[in-house]
Curated annotation (Swiss-Prot):
HAMAP family: TruB_bact. It is an enzyme of class 5 (isomerase). Responsible for synthesis of pseudouridine from uracil-55 in the psi GC loop of transfer RNAs. Keywords: Isomerase, tRNA processing. This is tRNA pseudouridine synthase B. It comes from Methylobacillus flagellatus (strain ATCC 51484 / DSM 6875 / VKM B-1610 / KT). Transmembrane segments: none annotated. Belongs to the pseudouridine synthase TruB family. Type 1 subfamily. It comes from the Bacteria.
Amino acid sequence: MQFKRVKRNIDGVLLLDKPLGISSNQALQMVKRLYQAAKAGHTGSLDPLASGLLPICLGEATKFSHFLLDADKSYRALVTLGSTTTTGDVEGEIMTQAPVTVTQSELEAILQDMVGDILQVPPMYSALKHEGKALYAYAREGVEIPRKPRPVTIHAIALERFDGKQFEMVVSCSKGTYIRTLAEDIGSRLGCGAHLGGLRRLTTAHFNLKNAVTIEQLDQMSQAERDAVLLQVDAAIEDFPIVTLDADSAFYLLQGQEVWKSGLSISGLFRLYSEQGAFLGLGEQTSRGSIAPRRLLRQAGE
């Protein structure tokens, strides 16, 4: 007889250091199994070729995962000059080759030219959908789908190392930026072609790798130790302003009603807490000046 594993209603944010060789969804399922979590979601895909920071939201934290999905991110990228590939990275077949005569000053100038608001054509080897089918599925069939350029922002690029054939750069960018495409565009600007040799995500929003754990480390922990490395649900939105409500206001807000707080003037979303410091959820000030609930925790209202 087979028994179903009991799922846990566990809430929090895990900072995972995803290894090479597995997809973000595979990493998510491993974490979900280790925590026996009833609900989990990641906050922005990393290709199997890429390693690094993958925040995973468990339980009620999934209500706020889209804020991390939309957040700025930074990466360390290894770029190989002198060749292009079918996938834009080291896993593809070489399409073109050219001699590399680039100097470091020329490379640095091109990198700085890429900083700012730019347009990127998404790669065919991506999870973007066309008529319900992922672009990479078309690419594997040899079908090229026209893609419209998308606006992204490159906040900064720092050249870390250059040996004449390869270079490492740290890129800070907006959501939706494809580092593979950035590498290809740099190679095109240099006139020699380029492809991505390796990629590691360093930050997502205000999170970094300092307190991230690996799947192997999680696997060796007891359940209590695993639970202890989880961040609180509100960690995903800690950049939002804080508003504290008295007991009566908190009660009515958790019933879905608008409440009032004198002297409040905040634009946009803010975090709501009880006088005891319990996180209630997100609220927003209406045009009338009242506080309207926007996203509340399940436990807070129970």
